[in-house]
Amino acid sequence: MAKFSALCSLALLGLATAQKPVGTETHEKLTTFRCTVAGGCVEKTNYIVLDSITGHRIYQPAAETLDCGARGAAPNVTACPTKEACAENCAMEGRTDYGSQGVSTDGASLRLQILHDGKKVAPRVYLLDETEAKYEMLRLTGNEFAFEVTMDKLPCGMNSALYLSEMEEDGGKSELNPGGAPWGTGYCDAQCYVTPFINGEGNIKGNGACCAEMDIWEANSRATHIAPHPCSKPGLYLCEGDECGSTGVCDKSGCAWNPNRIAQPHYYGNNDTFKVDTLKPMTVVTQFPTDASGKLAAIRRLYVQGGVVIKAETVHKAGLPEVDALTDPFCEAFGSQRYMALGATGGMGDALARGMVLVMSIWWDETGGNMQWLDGIASGSGPCNATEGAPANIPLVEPNPEVTFSNLKWGEIGSTFQGGARRL
């Protein structure tokens, strides 16, 4: 396992200049690949950084037992009456051992565990570029992205997520956030969540942090889901009131492609009777082809398992077009009204062309929904009953839920994978 440390300084800490440095931040090194049809894949070096809020201790140095706020609300009003005071009064402690947060790398593999010594850690991490100073910006319109995944330890209720967020390349680095990307700041997505800090600065007004989100992979061993989530505003947008809601600036639901929801229950599952057997490692390929004008026209999925390419099946369900990829006609027929209203596939492609940050995480649902939207019988999304995906029940089935993402590759369509005869 390769790890790289940088001594925290006032310029790297992510705090105002009056704040003292607090230790070191150690990034995990990860080998990735850039690919072309003519030249094949070239090895590159990237780094992994934990999210600033969920992966670090943020506290008040003047009263170290006190934090500076919780997810879902503006920051602590005593510590953060203003952004400037918030930067002065709140410290973020560096992480020297990502393993304690369920994160480890080995060459081209990234392992994420939801539990560490029996305690929930649910890590969310971002991909830094080779300098460790900013995020790697992926521009996938007209290209494809591939990765290998081992996920046999993800039962009902788990979610291994690999997706893109239109975060800022520098993580919102500023006078009040001199740390930026190396400290995992700047997260946003189409759910427009309220967090104590946005772009590393105190979120005094309690805004939501909105931006386009491309869910390439949300999955466990029982169900999988692709969902683009376009927004009407480019980049990070601070929403207020109704702008943050279900009819606001971002498509919260997205247009989902889940084999179970399109009458293909035999396609993906946890034994060898399924076309894609989740108990075995697989390569997941997602393609983003364009039309003649250069606009994103579709989002296409295929798998490679055992040296065999497994294409997406053509939809044969009443009311839906007979397509084998996520397209505007599919999304419109599926009832994805906000998706269509907020730019649809072309709008998602615009965000992908501008550049997005790669996010990877593992989590379970503690809101009471038990991840039924992803894998539940009631929602038509999978084979899981209403209670087996409850966080209290998951460790009874699998004591150590985890996922390993390996060999991340992106480049020209057709350049990231190899396989034998297609299996339909």
From Swiss-Prot:
Gene3D superfamilies: Glycoside hydrolase, family 7, domain
Signal peptide coordinates: 1-18
Entry's localization field: Secreted
GO CC annotations on file: extracellular region
Pfam families cross-referenced by the UniProt entry: Glyco_hydro_7
SS bond list: C35-C41, C68-C90, C80-C86, C156-C384, C188-C211, C192-C210, C231-C250, C239-C244, C255-C331
EC number: 3.2.1.4
Family: Belongs to the glycosyl hydrolase 7 (cellulase C) family.
Listed name of the protein: Endoglucanase 1
Gene source species: Pyricularia oryzae (strain 70-15 / ATCC MYA-4617 / FGSC 8958) (Rice blast fungus)
Gene that encodes it: egl1
